[in-house]
Amino acid sequence: MSENYTPRLKTRYREEIKKALNEEFKYENVMQIPGVTKVVVNMGVGDAARDSKMINGALEDLTAITGQKPQVRRAKKSIANFKLREGMPIGARVTLRGDRMWEFLDRLLTIALPRIRDFRGLSDQQFDGHGNYTFGLSEQTMFYEIDIDKVDRPRGMDITVVTSATNDEEGRKLLRELGFPFK
């Protein structure tokens, strides 16, 4: 990215959303205004325990969606019932920060979520008590970076938006201002 480019959602956060949050919660210090710290995209591939090629599809999908190479997550311990051995790859994870995070959130909110069939909004009950929000997507085809013809099987993913908010009320207000479509 060029050095003078700023993602549009980041610009909106700095110019409009920070002021709105400060007016509502009346912070004493501007550093108390909540912001988005990072976004973690996790794709669990339990079938990779039986077929090690399954993880490659998840890695390619996550790379296309986020623009960043995923980290392979391995099993911490062996579980005989799941035919799982310690060290086997069972998932992939990407942590987005900075401009890549703002670009991903912008694409998620404006392009990907509206493409979900029968989408009625995200639940606003999935906050963790500290202002962080986690939600799941059932398949990866809603992202336009994924070529639907090349998808071997639908894979879901978990997306966690980590904020610097101290409680759920502040986190909910921040994400609603950013454009998250809560029910």
Swiss-Prot record:
Any GO molecular function: structural constituent of ribosome
Gene Ontology terms: cellular component: ribonucleoprotein complex; ribosome
The keyword Ribosomal protein is annotated on this UniProt entry: yes
Keyword tRNA-binding in annotation: yes
Pfam families for the chain: Ribosomal_L5 (PF00281), Ribosomal_L5_C (PF00673)
InterPro entries: Ribosomal_uL5, Ribosomal_uL5_bac-type, Ribosomal_uL5_C, Ribosomal_uL5_dom_sf, Ribosomal_uL5_N
GO biological process: translation
Organism domain of life: Bacteria
Keywords: Ribonucleoprotein, Ribosomal protein, RNA-binding, rRNA-binding, tRNA-binding
Gene3D superfamilies: 3.30.1440.10
NCBIfam families noted in UniProt: PRK00010.1
Family: Belongs to the universal ribosomal protein uL5 family.
Job of this protein: This is one of the proteins that bind and probably mediate the attachment of the 5S RNA into the large ribosomal subunit, where it forms part of the central protuberance. In the 70S ribosome it contacts protein S13 of the 30S subunit (bridge B1b), connecting the 2 subunits; this bridge is implicated in subunit movement. Contacts the P site tRNA; the 5S rRNA and some of its associated proteins might help stabilize positioning of ribosome-bound tRNAs.
Complexes and interactors: Part of the 50S ribosomal subunit; part of the 5S rRNA/L5/L18/L25 subcomplex. Contacts the 5S rRNA and the P site tRNA. Forms a bridge to the 30S subunit in the 70S ribosome.
Name listed for the protein in its UniProt record: Large ribosomal subunit protein uL5
Gene symbol of the encoding locus: rplE
